Design a protein with these regions (language model features):
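Conserved catalytic core of sirtuin-type NAD+-dependent deacylases
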Residues: 1-137
Length: 137
């Protein structure tokens, strides 16, 4: 396994440019699992779980809420927690240290906007599903 990591590191060092694809696995490694009915979800969204039977973030994003107010209560809490209160963690910081000096472009389905705060150039990050911070009611 260690040899594999050395080979990957060497390939990164020798590459002229990098195309980085990032999806839920990266967020999960940072502790944000949109599929999980975990401690974090129950702590921050337990009221939505009790009231509507929502068991994870993904269900909450696509749930048919009875009112716009209840829908935006969920969305605004999610945006506040994941995009403003929680900062990117060591996985994102290490990724930037590993590749940030290279010519790169990132394509991601992650919407929590954790690439730019660690140093990645916003113009080199394409969030194909948008950014939660750009949501509008």
């Amino acid at each position: 396994m260690e040899e594999n990591f050395r080979n990957i590191y060497k390939a990164i060092q020798e590459a002229d440019a990098l195309l980085i694809g990032a999806s839920n696995g990266l967020s999960i490694s940072e502790g944000y699992n949109i599929f999980a009915d975990d401690h974090w979800f129950q702590k921050d969204f337990g009221d939505f779980r009790s009231r509507y039977g929502i068991r994870n973030i993904l269900q909450g994003l696509f749930f048919q809420y009875p009112t716009e107010e209840s829908k935006w209560a969920f969305f605004s809490r999610l945006i506040s927690r994941k995009c403003y209160l929680e900062q990117p963690g060591p996985v994102m910081e290490n990724l930037y240290r590993l590749v940030g000096y290279k010519d790169y472009f990132i394509v991601t389905s992650n919407g929590e906007d954790h690439f730019v705060p660690v140093g990645f150039d916003r113009d080199k990050v394409f969030e194909m599903e948008g950014r939660l911070t750009q949501s509008r009611c």
